[in-house]
A protein has these predicted regions:
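Divalent cation-coordinating acidic motifs and surrounding scaffolds
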Residues: 1-177
Length: 177
């Protein structure tokens, strides 16, 4: 993660990272809404602490960059696990938007990796929940998905879900991946 000097760009990936670089442009004073979708199933056990740290670092970099005032940036968090009967705790857990990085850090600290039960998880439910969040009307919107598994109902013929329960709410929406 790096701020590019004398540039309106905040790069959210480490150099040489095994990821697609995410670039947060700040050319205009439009508000920014950034939502993190965090897999909290048991398979995330070895990774959840570093995922929480990476999210905190991203929020700190964006908030501390001085390129956007506090009232122009909001962060959201949705934790997701799996659909019953594989997991009975929750499918999604929504924390809503906040401009306060300390609140975001408290929300992140509450995440515990547990449950799941099969390979695919409830990413489509998390995406559907993200679509229904209280987005600022004129905000530039970004969703960052953090997971190690494929979603139920999309491309997994033997996962027991012929179609994701939330896929219909995603149909017709435009996503950049």
């Amino acid at each position: 993660m790096a701020l590019i000097p004398k540039s309106p760009t905040i790069n959210l990936c480490r150099p040489n990272a095994h990821a697609i670089p995410l670039v947060f442009q700040s050319d205009t004073p439009d508000p920014r809404d950034v939502v993190f979708l965090q897999d909290t199933t048991g398979s995330q056990g070895p990774y959840i602490q570093s995922a929480r740290k990476a999210i905190r670092d991203i929020c700190d970099k964006i908030s501390g960059s001085g390129r956007l005032s506090k009232d122009l940036i909001r962060f959201g968090l949705i934790a997701f696990r799996d659909h019953p009967p594989q997991d009975k705790t929750y499918v999604t857990k929504e924390f809503g938007f906040t401009s306060d990085v300390d609140v975001m850090q408290k929300n992140l600290a509450s995440l515990v990796a547990s449950g799941g039960g099969d390979g695919p998880e409830a990413q489509t439910a998390a995406l559907a929940a993200a679509l229904n969040m209280d987005w600022a009307e004129n905000a530039v919107k970004m969703v960052i998905l953090i997971t190690d598994s494929p979603p139920h109902g999309i491309g997994e013929a033997s996962d027991g879900f012929t179609e994701s329960p939330d896929r219909k709410s995603l149909d017709g929406r435009r996503f950049a991946t």
